[in-house]
């Protein structure tokens, strides 16, 4: 600990029999204190975020923090603004973009693209988790919103099954297959077997169309009919089949097809 020692004033002459007291020392103690970094710049986004919170930053400044540095002859703020402009200045559209889109943007290499893709996926998973916790199964709109978050932006087809108890409480959500409905292995007997294992009273099935169109195909309708009949044999019910696009959904139940 740093200290400074100061000599006491000279003492008067004393008799040898009367020894002089030991000289006193005054110690100045400097307590440690927080100091700003020498190069702290409160006007920069990172410093303002730490001092005032993320709400103090613009969308472009938040994106700039993710990019870290500029590229393609631009500084980082110009790069962030250009990236947002590509998506109509919409953070949501940027987060909904397919992963490969980022690597085609000037100045964004694999490292920066990986950061953006990771943030996109973290955001998506957090929203899916939040939606699942709050999802009332007896609300078709809430179920469709959850499914759109979970599989709406996948670049390939995914088949999802929601297993429900007798009170329409959610038991489990499982992704049964990937690919396309004409090629992926969706076996009604396996879904029925899983329903029996989970003691499920009813099910909701869903799959996405990466093209964005939600009109069911003939194969979609055939699979729905076969599964509906197979579940009826074990006293379980197919409540709905939801086709999920990027921005819309189609409900077999709402259309009167179940």
UniProtKB/Swiss-Prot annotation:
Record-listed Zn(2+) binding positions: 207, 209, 220
BP terms from Gene Ontology: proteolysis
A Pfam family the protein falls into: RadC
Lineage of origin: Bacteria, Pseudomonadati, Pseudomonadota, Betaproteobacteria, Burkholderiales
Cysteine disulfide partners in this protein: none
Keyword match Metal-binding: yes
Protein name per UniProt: UPF0758 protein Bcep1808_2579
Chain span(s) of sequence motif JAMM motif: 207-220
UniProt entry keywords in alphabetical sequence: Hydrolase, Metal-binding, Metalloprotease, Protease, Zinc
Listed InterPro entries: MPN, RadC_JAB, UPF0758, UPF0758_CS, UPF0758_N
Organism: Burkholderia vietnamiensis (strain G4 / LMG 22486) (Burkholderia cepacia (strain R1808))
Origin: domain of life: Bacteria
Protein family membership: Belongs to the UPF0758 family.
